[in-house]
Curated annotation (Swiss-Prot), chains A, B, C, D, E, F:
Gene that specifies this protein: rph
Keywords of this entry: Nucleotidyltransferase, RNA-binding, rRNA processing, Transferase, tRNA processing, tRNA-binding
Binding site for phosphate: 87, 125-127
CDD domains from the UniProt entry: RNase_PH_bact
An example Gene Ontology molecular-function term: 3'-5'-RNA exonuclease activity
Organism: Azotobacter vinelandii (strain DJ / ATCC BAA-1303)
Stored PANTHER family: EXOSOME COMPLEX COMPONENT, EXOSOME COMPLEX COMPONENT RRP41
Protein EC: 2.7.7.56
Statement: the UniProt record of this protein carries the keyword RNA-binding: yes
Functional description taken from the UniProt entry: Phosphorolytic 3'-5' exoribonuclease that plays an important role in tRNA 3'-end maturation. Removes nucleotide residues following the 3'-CCA terminus of tRNAs; can also add nucleotides to the ends of RNA molecules by using nucleoside diphosphates as substrates, but this may not be physiologically important. Probably plays a role in initiation of 16S rRNA degradation (leading to ribosome degradation) during starvation.
Annotated protein name in UniProt: Ribonuclease PH
Catalytic reactions of this protein: tRNA(n+1) + phosphate = tRNA(n) + a ribonucleoside 5'-diphosphate
InterPro entries in the record: ExoRNase_PH_dom1, ExoRNase_PH_dom2, ExoRNase_PH_dom2_sf, PNPase/RNase_PH_dom_sf, Ribosomal_Su5_D2-typ_SF, RNase_PH, RNase_PH_bac-type, RNase_PH_CS
Gene Ontology biological-process entries: rRNA catabolic process; rRNA processing; tRNA processing
C-alpha cells in the first residue's frame, strides 16, 4: 500500500499553529495540517444564553465556515444561499462539544466564548484541524479573560485535540488529506483529551463496513497522532 | 448499578415493528422501541437528483422530524421557525448514509427513494429506532418497485440496523431510554450490517472521557443488541 | 347519484377518537374520519404572548402539518423547504379561531394552549377532523390544568366540532373523502357549537357557482353530521 | 341600531374604480370602497407554470400586499420580515380562486396572468375591494391580450364581484368599514358571479355564533350589494 | 444631442408633491417626477432601537419597495421571494442616511420615525424622488409630533432634496427618465441640503469612465436642479 | 491636524499584495492595507447566467464577507443569521461593477468569474482594498483561462483600483483606517481606471455636508493614491 501523499501510514502532515494570527479576537490562531488551513478565533463576551442565566456558569459555542473557494470547486456561499448546510451544522456542533469538554464552566463565570473556525484552504481533515487549532486559541483567550479579572478560577480542565484516521486499501492510515479521504473505505474522526480519554469517536464506512479489529487499529493510530498534536500544542503555547 | 428502567444492562426495550402502517407510501412502518415511536415511510419516485443523471443509478435520501409535542416540553415546529435545526440535519444525514449502505444503487435503476422518519413520541434512541424501522419499510418499498418492474436487479445488498449504547454509572448498558440517556456519561450510536460490520459508530462523552476498553465493551453490547434487532426484522418481514 | 365511497349522502365515515394517544402532551388524541388520521395534541405553557400580557387572560394558538407521505404523492417537507405553505397557514388559522370559540379566555388564566394537528394519513377532510379531534384533546388538557390549579374557573364555554359537506353530481353529500372532494362542484367546511350556532362557514365553488338553496341544503346536512360528532365526542369523553 | 359610519344597513360606501391607473400593466385599476384604496394590476406573461405545461391552457395567480402604513398602526414590511403572513396568503389565495372562476382557461392560451392587489389605505373590506377592482383590470388585460393575438377565444365566462357583510349589534349590515368590522359579531365575505351564483362564502363568528337565519339575511344583503357592484363595473368598463 | 424625453439638458420633469396622500400616517406624500410615482409615508412611534436606549435621542430609518408591476416587466414580489434584493437595501440605506442628515436627533426625543417609500410607477429616478418627497412627509410628521408634545425642540436642521444627473451622448443631463438612464454612460445621484452642501454623491460609470470635469459639470447641473426642488418643497409646504 | 495614524494626509498605509495565496482558485490574492487584510479569489466556471445565454459573452459577479471576528466586536455570522446584511450587499455590488469595468465581456467567452472577497481582519477601507486586490487576482485568473484556451481574445481592457478618502478635522486625508473613518466628517470611496477615469465615486457626509471644493480636493488625493496603487499592482504582477 502506498499513500497518495507518500507519507508513512502513521505519519502526520506537517502541522503548524500560528498564534495571534489576527488582532481583534481574544484568541486567534492559524492552524495548518499540510495544505488544510483554518483560522480559529475565540471571542469572549460577558453574559450567557438565556437557558443558563443566573447559574453563575459560562458557555462556549462554535461556528464553522469555509470560504467559497477553499475547495477544488467553488461552493456557493452559505450566507448568500440563506442557510448553513447540514455538513456545516454537524461540524460546528462537533467543535462545540469537543471544546466544552476542555472547560469547567462553573469557573468561567457568566461569559460566553464564541469559537469561529473558518477554512481558508481545504485539503481534508478540516474539522479535526479546527478542534486542534481552536484549543490553542481557547487557552490564549482564557489568559486574556484572566487578566481582565473575568474568571472565577481556572476553567481549563484538560487539553483537547483531534485527528482523522481511515482505512485505505485495507490498511489504517493517519491524518488523511483530501485525495486519501476520497478513496478511503472508512473515515474516522477522533477527539481526545491529553489524559488519554475519548471525547468523540465518529466513524463512517464509505464503502465496505469495518470490523472491530479495524476500528481498534484506527483508534491506536489516532491515539499516537493526537499525542504528537498535544506536544505541538504545548510547544506552541510555551513560546 | 440499577438502570432507571429496571432493565438488565444488556436488555433491549420491547421492540415492535408494524408494517403497512399508513396507506399511501411504498413502504410504511411504525417502529416502537419502548415508548419511542417513529413512523417511517419510504416513497419511490422515478428520476434522480441532477448530480446522478444519466448514470443509470438510483439514490436514497432521508428526512427526519419530530412532532412538536413528541417530547416532554413542546418544541417549536421547524416548519414554522423556517429552518431545520442542526440536530435534525445531523440525524437525517446519518439515516441516509446508513440506509444507502444497504443498497446497490446500480440495481435500483434511476429511482429516488425518500425515507421519512417522523417521531410521534420520543423516549430516547429516536435515530437508531428510525434506522431499524426504516430498513423494514425499505424492503417493502423495494418489493413494490419490483412488482412495478422498475428495478434492474435486486438492490438489497444487506440488512442494516442500529442501537444506542452508553456508559451509565460506570457500566455499559444497551438501548438507553430518555432518563438513562440524560444521565449517561457516554452515548454511542452504532449502525451495523447483518454480516456483522460497522456502518457508523458515533460516540460522545457527555461527562467523563471514555477509555478504549469501555468503547469495546459498548460495541460488544451493541453487536449483541443489533443481532436481536436483525432477528426481529426478519420475523416481521416473514409475516 | 352514487358516491364513490358507496355511502349514503348523509352518512359520515366511521369516526374514531382515541384519547391519550401520546404520553407527553396535556391532551393527546388520534382522530380518524375513515382513512383520514390526525394526531391532535394540546400543550399548556404558563405565560401568554406579548400582546396579552398583564390582562389576566389566556390564549390558544394552533399549528397544522402533514407528514410528507400522508398523501398519495409525497409532498416536500415544509421544514426543509423553509416555509409553511398558504394552505397550511389557512388551515391552522381556522383551527385556532374555531377552538378559541370554545373557551372563555378570562377563566384560562395567563396560560397558552398550543394545539398541534399533524396529519399522518390524508383522505379528505383533514381540517374538520383536526378541529373535531383537537376539541377532545382540549377538554383533556383543561382537566390537567385544573388539577394543577392553573385555572381561574372553568374556561369551557361550549363544545365545537366540524365537518365538510359538498355538492357532488348535483346533490349535497356529507363528509367527503378525497376522491369525492376532488370531483365535487362545491366544498363547504362548517364549524359549529353544540348549542347549534355557526363558528365558521367556508364554501368554495370548485366548478359551477352554487345557489342559496344548495347552500342551505349543505348547511342542513352539516348540522346533522356535526350533531353526530358531538354525541361521539361526549361518548369518548365519558369513558 | 346605528352604524358608526352613519350608513343605512344595506348601504354601500361610495365606490370608485379608476381604470388605467398605472402605465405598465396590461390592466391597472385603483379601486376605492370609501377610504379603502387598493391598486389592482393584471400582468400577462407568455408561458404557464410547470404543472400546466403542454395542456394548451392558461393560468391566473394572485398576490396581495399592504403598504406598511396602510393601517392605523404601521405594520412590519413583509419583504423585510422575510415572509408573508398567514392573513396575506389566505387573502391572495381567495383572490386567485375568485378570479379564476371568471375565466375559461382553455381559451386563455398558454399565458399566465399575475394579479397584484396592493392596499394603499385600509379601512375594512380590502379583500372584497381587491376582487371587485381586479375583475375590471382583468377585463382590460384580456383586451390587450386579444389585440396581441395571444388568446384562443374569449376567456371571459362571467363577471365576479365581492362584498363583506356582518352582524352588527344584532342586525345585518353591508360593506363594513374598519370600526364596524372591529365591533361586528360576525364577518362574512361573499364572492358572486353576475349570474347570481356563489363562488366563495366565508363567514366567521368573532363573538357569538351565528344562526342559519342570520346567515341567510347576510347573504341576501350581500347579493343586493354585489348586484350594485356589477352595475358599477359595467358602467366603468363602458367608458 | 437630443434627449429621448425631448427636454433641455438642464430641465427637470414636471414635479408634483401631494401632501396628506393617505390618511393614517403622521406624514404622507405622493411624489411624482414625471411618470415616476412614489408614496412616501413617515410613521412615528415612541421608543428607539436598542443601541440608542437611554440616550434621550431619536432615530429615523427607511424602507423602500416597488409594486411588482411598477416596472415595464413584472418583477417578483420581494415579500413572496422571502428577501429584499441588494438594490432595495442599497436604496433604503441611502434614503435613511439622507433624511437623518436633516434632523438633530437630540431634539427628536426618544421617538423612531419610519420612512416608507413605495414606488407605484417607475420611470427612472425613484430613489431621488423618494428622498425629495419623503422630506416633505417628514416635515408634516414633525408637525404632528410637535402637536402631541413629543419633541424636545425643533429637530429640523435643514431641508434635503435629491436628483439624478448623467452623461448622455457625451453631455450632462438632469433628472433622467428610464430610457435616458438605460442609455447614459454615467449615472450620478446627488443629495444636497438647502444650505448648498452635499450629503451623498454616488456616481457610476455604466460605460466609459468619467473625468473630473464631467463630474463637476454634472454636480453643477444637480445643484441647479435641487435648488428648484427646494423651491417646490417650500411652495408645497406653504399651502 | 494630526491623523490618529500619524501618517501624512496624502500617505497610504503600507500596502501588500501576495499572489497565489491559496491553492485552488484560478486567481488568489491576500491584500493588506495596513491592518486591513482581505483574501480575494477569482474562480472561473464555464457557462453564464440565464440572462446572458447564447450571446457569446462572459460575466463577472462578486461576493463579499467578513469573518465574524474580523472586527473589534464579534459580529453575527451572516450564514447563521440566514441573510446577508445591506452593507454586505452594497459592497459586493460595488466590487462587481468595478471589476466588470476592467473587462471586455465579449472576449471572455461564455465563462463566469466569481470574485470572493473575504475580510480576515478589518481596519477600515475593506471595500477599496477588496477591489484593488481582486484586480490582481483577476489578472491571474485570466492568465489561467488563456492557458486553458477558454478565451476569445484578451478581455482585459484596463486596470482598476480603489481607495478611500475623507475629510478629517476639516482636512482631506487619504486611505482612512478605522479610527480615522469613525471620526471623519466625510467618507468618499473612489474607483478609477489606470487611464485616469472614474468608475465609481461614492461620498457620504457623516457629519457636516461637504462642499464642491472639498469634493475636488478629496478626488485629487484619491487620484494620487490610486496612481500609487496601480504602480504597486504592476510591480506585483511583474514578479
Amino acid at each position: 500500500m502506498k499513500r497518495p501523499s507518500g507519507r508513512a501510514p502513521h505519519q502526520l502532515r506537517p502541522i503548524r499553529i500560528t498564534r495571534n494570527y489576527t488582532r481583534h479576537a481574544e484568541g486567534s490562531v492559524l492552524v495548518e495540517f499540510g495544505d488544510t488551513r483554518v483560522i480559529c478565533t475565540v471571542s469572549a463576551e460577558a453574559g450567557v444564553p438565556r437557558f443558563l442565566k443566573g447559574q453563575g456558569k459560562g458557555w462556549l459555542t462554535a461556528e464553522y465556515g469555509m470560504l467559497p473557494r477553499a475547495t477544488g470547486e467553488r461552493m456557493a456561499r452559505e450566507a448568500s444561499r440563506g442557510r448553513q448546510g447540514g455538513r456545516t451544522l454537524e461540524i460546528q456542533r462537533l467543535i462545540g462539544r469537543s471544546l466544552r469538554a476542555a472547560l469547567d464552566m462553573s469557573k468561567l463565570g457568566e461569559n460566553t466564548l464564541y469559537v469561529d473556525c473558518d477554512v481558508i484552504q481545504a485539503d481534508g481533515g478540516t474539522r479535526t484541524a479546527s478542534i486542534t487549532g481552536a484549543m490553542v486559541a481557547l487557552v490564549d483567550a482564557l489568559a486574556v479573560l484572566k487578566k481582565r479579572g473575568a474568571l472565577k478560577g481556572d476553567p481549563l480542565k484538560q487539553m483537547v485535540a483531534a485527528v482523522s484516521v481511515g482505512i485505505y486499501q485495507g490498511e489504517p492510515i493517519l491524518d488523511l488529506d483530501y485525495p486519501e479521504d476520497s478513496d478511503a473505505e472508512t473515515d474516522l474522526n477522533v477527539v481526545m483529551t491529553d489524559a488519554g480519554g475519548f471525547i468523540e469517536v465518529q466513524g463512517t464506512a464509505e464503502g465496505e463496513p469495518f470490523q472491530p479489529e479495524e476500528l481498534n487499529a484506527m483508534l491506536a493510530l489516532a491515539t499516537q497522532g493526537i499525542r504528537e498534536l498535544f506536544e505541538l500544542q504545548r510547544a506552541v503555547l510555551a513560546d
